[in-house]
């Protein structure tokens, strides 16, 4: 459960990211593919090379979904219901992949904003990404 301090940390960090969210989403997705090659199996139709326009575009979708989640932190299940359905029923993404991407998102954000990435912010973002992952995998049960 996200505390009021966690919500404040997540919102303020996301505000600082601003217009870079899509860029960071693409970078995190590329980092996920490089670090965890099995995640590539869900994207056989993508050009997965460094700087791929398809990876960047999908990374922007991820970032947009997270921006929506940040805006609706008090109702993540409602905000992410359609995405949960898509990933569980149509795409059948292995739930572990959400944790892997979450880790890569944390690394990407820490690389770009080291001064702001305090232990408290790190913990809050980790809890937030975990909450998002839990919602996205809730339909698997």
UniProtKB/Swiss-Prot annotation:
This protein's UniProt keywords: Acetylation, Heme, Iron, Metal-binding, Oxygen transport, Phosphoprotein, Transport
Ranges for domain Globin: 1-141
Phosphoserine carried by residues: 3, 35, 49, 102, 124, 138
Gene Ontology CC annotations of this record: blood microparticle; haptoglobin-hemoglobin complex; hemoglobin complex
Residues bearing PTM N6-succinyllysine: 7, 11, 16, 40
GO BP annotation list: hydrogen peroxide catabolic process
Positions carrying Phosphothreonine: 8, 108, 134, 137
Modified residues (Phosphotyrosine): 24
Tissue spec. comment: Red blood cells.
Binding site for O2: 58
UniProt xrefs under InterPro entries: Globin, Globin-like_sf, Globin/Proto, Hemoglobin_a-typ, Hemoglobin_oxygen_transport, Hemoglobin_pi
One MF annotation (Gene Ontology) recorded for this entry: oxygen binding
One Pfam short name: Globin
PROSITE patterns: GLOBIN
Residue numbers carrying N6-acetyllysine: 16
Protein residues bound to heme b: 87
Subunit and interaction comment: Heterotetramer of two alpha chains and two beta chains.
Annotated family: Belongs to the globin family.
Function: Involved in oxygen transport from the lung to the various peripheral tissues.
Name assigned to this protein: Hemoglobin subunit alpha-1/2
Organism whose genome encodes this protein: Mustela putorius
Taxonomic lineage of the native organism: Eukaryota, Metazoa, Chordata, Craniata, Vertebrata
């Amino acid at each position: 459960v996200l505390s009021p301090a966690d919500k404040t940390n997540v919102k303020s960090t996301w505000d600082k990211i601003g217009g870079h969210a899509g860029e960071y989403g693409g970078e995190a997705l590329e980092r996920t593919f490089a670090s965890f090659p099995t995640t590539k199996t869900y994207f056989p139709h993508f050009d997965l090379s460094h700087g791929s326009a398809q990876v960047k575009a999908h990374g922007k979708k991820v970032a947009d979904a997270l921006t929506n989640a940040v805006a609706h932190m008090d109702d993540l299940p409602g905000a992410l219901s359609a995405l949960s359905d898509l990933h569980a029923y149509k795409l059948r993404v292995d739930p572990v992949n959400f944790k892997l991407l979450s880790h890569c998102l944390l690394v990407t954000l820490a690389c770009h904003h080291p001064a702001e990435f305090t232990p408290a912010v790190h913990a809050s973002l980790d809890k937030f990404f975990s909450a998002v992952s839990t919602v996205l995998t809730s339909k698997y049960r």
